[in-house]
From Swiss-Prot:
The chain crosses the membrane at residues 33-53, 77-98, 113-133, 178-198, 226-246, 288-308, 320-340, 347-367. Its cofactor is heme b. One of its GO terms (cellular component) is mitochondrial inner membrane. GO terms for biological process: mitochondrial electron transport, ubiquinol to cytochrome c. Signal peptide: none annotated. It comes from the Eukaryota. Binds 2 heme b groups non-covalently. Heme b b566 binds at H97, H196. This is Cytochrome b. The keyword Transmembrane helix applies. A ubiquinone binds at H201. It is found in: Mitochondrion inner membrane. The lineage of its organism: Eukaryota, Metazoa, Chordata, Craniata, Vertebrata.
Amino acid sequence: MTNIRKTHPLIKMINHSFIDLPTPSNISTWWNFGSLLGLCLAIQILTGLFLAMHYTSDTITAFSSVTHICRDVNYGWLIRYIHANGASMFFICLFLHVGRGVYYGSYTYFETWNIGVILLLTVMATAFMGYVLPWGQMSFWGATVITNLLSAIPYIGTTLVEWIWGGFSVDKATLTRFFAFHFILPFIIAALAMVHLLFLHETGSNNPSGLISDSDKIPFHPYYTIKDILGVLLLISILMILVLFSPDLLGDPDNYTPANPLSTPPHIKPEWYFLFAYAILRSIPNKLGGVLALVFSILILMLFPLLHLSKQRSMMFRPLSQCVFWILVADLITLTWIGGQPVEYPYIIIGQLASILYFTIILLILPIISLIENKLLKW
């Protein structure tokens, strides 16, 4: 009898993707984040579904419905905090996943990398719209400030903003459409993730050395399934410690105050995972310039394959590039810190210097260092 795993049309696809998949024998823990992102997405879709059963997307009742979920629904508080902190875990895994891709040169798989950047943008859009839904002070003012940025687009800007708002300010129409988009986008993300995997399995996985590993492949199951389970247990442990001991650690206290269009919070800031981009936006005094810098701070990832001038794929054997990479990581941490600080001296100048350094490292320093390393290695 033939093995059903290898003959059944549906099970055969799963088999080729997760069981008999030939995988490089030397991939490290940095390759765990793909599966962890899949887990995060599943957690977010499930908890989000249960939250949507009790949530109402109306400006009058939205805040009360979230309170009702936390107080009256069975384990509603748990579902809500898993969803809120699950988003933070999602972004931690995303940043580490992208960082791994940059360090080990995974961006040379053009299609996989570009779909990944589109995925990152979609997840960011989804998270932003989700932050608006509880209709607290920071939800309302965050939505107002970020959507208003589109008014910097010449000619059509103001019309575009009012079209997104569904009126002349952030109101019921805005909240309703944000809820609709926040609900549908995770399913689009899941579909894009499938395309991401499809392209990845066309070429096979990269590995820390950056060398072709066709001569040394092992089956995904049991070697990497057991390794992924370890990552899953660690992720769930960290998430549950966060949820059960300090659920509001990464949130903003202002969001426990119902939205009030007549009272502006002293410091309007997004969730922690957007602070680096927010700092870049604030560093440029010109509105349009700031918006372009904000968009380009993410889209610049698409340029990595074009800026790769090294003869080696991975940074594993390139100590100079490694130093520059870790300076870039430190710079992003600095930007995240600056994004949460008030707009005053010395934070303004630190933010501007960190923003300049961010673009300079990616566009100039890394390619130049790559060429220097080629010379040193007589390539």
